[in-house]
Curated annotation (Swiss-Prot):
The gene is deoD. SUPFAM superfamilies: Purine and uridine phosphorylases. It comes from the Bacteria. The record marks 217 as: Important for catalytic activity. The lineage of its organism: Bacteria, Bacillati, Bacillota, Clostridia, Eubacteriales. PANTHER family: FI09636P-RELATED, URIDINE PHOSPHORYLASE. The active site is at residue 204. It catalyses: a purine D-ribonucleoside + phosphate = a purine nucleobase + alpha-D-ribose 1-phosphate; a purine 2'-deoxy-D-ribonucleoside + phosphate = a purine nucleobase + 2-deoxy-alpha-D-ribose 1-phosphate. This is Purine nucleoside phosphorylase DeoD-type. Phosphate binds at residues 20, 24, 43, 87-90. It comes from Clostridium perfringens (strain ATCC 13124 / DSM 756 / JCM 1290 / NCIMB 6125 / NCTC 8237 / Type A).
Length: 235
């Protein structure tokens, strides 16, 4: 048991899916896993372990933002021995050729968070995905007939920005989407020498203003869940 996760030793698999929304964790477990067991309810951040096509898989909610996901990723790796972490989340599209409900595989992440500035004494660190997971997810998505977008994303430290046009500078440099966790996930994976990948569904669009409901975000973005799970069983 760690400070924020109530699981006992051996209850969490080496491969884990990380949705921000704990209710999405519950949906994934109940929809896709065989014999799911809830191992965590601390602070309402639900976590489950079951099997998917014969492989032991866990799914753990992380909450929103760099500080929250950092707590769970640190404890999952350090205290429970997790080796493969796949974030399944939502993002806002920044490019015209990316549509709502498209899949995005985050190859790398920019951020305005100061967390790595502090960690690296003011220097920059480039948080990147594990190629092993990136390739597995890309191949899986293509085999399923999907057309995933692969590229950089922007990890924002705040959801509400006083400068609503700030995202346009990132878009000019080819950034695909904005979310709030990937930079932290990739940095911690590098620190501990484990594998990490973010798979995103575009839930809203900064150019077209199209958006989805909270219920849709919770229960209908199943393509990324299937890609994550089928990629996970190849590891």
């Amino acid at each position: 048991m760690s400070i924020h996760i109530g699981a006992k030793e051996g209850q969490i698999a080496e491969t884990i899916l990380l949705p921000g929304d704990p209710l999405r964790a519950k949906f994934i477990a109940e929809t896709f896993l065989e014999n799911p067991v809830c191992y965590n309810e601390v602070r309402g951040m639900l976590g489950y372990t079951g099997t998917y096509k014969g492989k032991k898989i866990s799914v753990q909610g992380t909450g929103m933002g760099v500080p929250s996901i950092s707590i769970y990723v640190n404890e999952l790796i350090r205290d429970y021995g997790v080796k493969n972490l796949i974030r399944v989340g939502t993002a806002g599209g920044m490019q015209e050729d990316i549509k709502v409900r498209d899949l995005v595989l985050a190859m790398s992440s920019h951020t305005d968070s100061a967390i790595n500035k502090v960690r690296f004494n003011g220097l920059d660190f480039a948080p990147t995905a594990s190629f092993k997971l990136l390739k597995a997810a890309y191949d899986t998505a293509v085999e399923k007939g999907y057309s995933p977008k692969v590229g950089s994303v922007f990890t924002a430290d705040s959801f509400y920005n006083d400068n609503p046009e700030a995202w346009k500078q990132w878009a000019k440099f080819g950034t695909l989407a904005v979310e709030m966790e990937t930079a932290a996930l990739y940095t911690l994976a590098a620190k501990y020498g484990v594998n990490a990948l973010t798979i995103l569904t575009i839930s809203d669009h900064l150019i077209t203003a199209e958006e989805t409901t909270s219920e849709e975000r919770q229960t209908t973005f199943t393509k990324m869940m299937e890609v994550a799970l089928d990629a996970a069983i190849t590891l």
